[in-house]
Amino acid sequence: MKASEMKKGSIVEYNNGTYQIRDIQRSSPQGRGGNVRFRFVMYSVPGGSKLEASFDADEMLTAVELLRREASFSYKDGEAFVFLDEENYTLYTLDAEAIGDNAGYISEGLSGCYVQLIDASPVALQLPQHVVLEVVDTPPELKGGTATKRPKPAKLITGIEVMVPEYITTGERILVNTTTGAFGGRAS
C-alpha cells in the first residue's frame, strides 16, 4: 500500500516490526519536481515504543491484516481499559499506552468500538466517529453580551475540555467528534 494511502490507525510492517500509525504530516514540495513526503508518528504493536519515519508518497508499505471485533467499554482496571466483545463475551484488555489520547472519549457504556487484534492479542482500539459525553463544568451563558457566537470551554465527564456554544449548560449531554475533538451538537 502506498504511503499516501495510509490513514491514522493503520497497522504496517516496518524495520522488522509492527507499528500503528498515530499521526500523519504531509509536506508539500518546494519548487518544481519535488516529491510530496509523509511523516508518520508510529507506535510499536504491541509495546508502544514511538518511532517517527518519513516516506515518499509512492513508497510502498506492507499493511498488516487485523481482525476487528466490535466491543463495548466494560470497566477500567487500574490504568488498563477492559472491553467486552458483544458477540462472544470475550474480554479484551488494552493498556493506557495502546489507548493513547482516545482515553478522553471513553466513558461508561460506550459501545460501537472496534478492538483490533493481531494473533488473537488486542493491540489497538478504533472509536466510533462521535461519542456522547456529559458536560460537568462550563461557565454560564452571558445574556445580551454580544450578537456574535462565542464558544466557551466545557469540561466533560472524562476530564477532557472542548469548546462549545454559549447555550450549552452544565449537566447536558453532547456529541464529540473523536477524530477532531470538536463539539458535534446536543445528544438526543
Swiss-Prot record:
Lineage: superkingdom: Bacteria
GO molecular function annotation: translation elongation factor activity
One Gene Ontology term, aspect cellular component: cytoplasm
PROSITE patterns linked: EFP
GO biological process annotation, one example: peptide biosynthetic process
Family label: Belongs to the elongation factor P family.
Name used for this protein in its record: Elongation factor P-like protein
Gene source species: Xylella fastidiosa (strain M12)
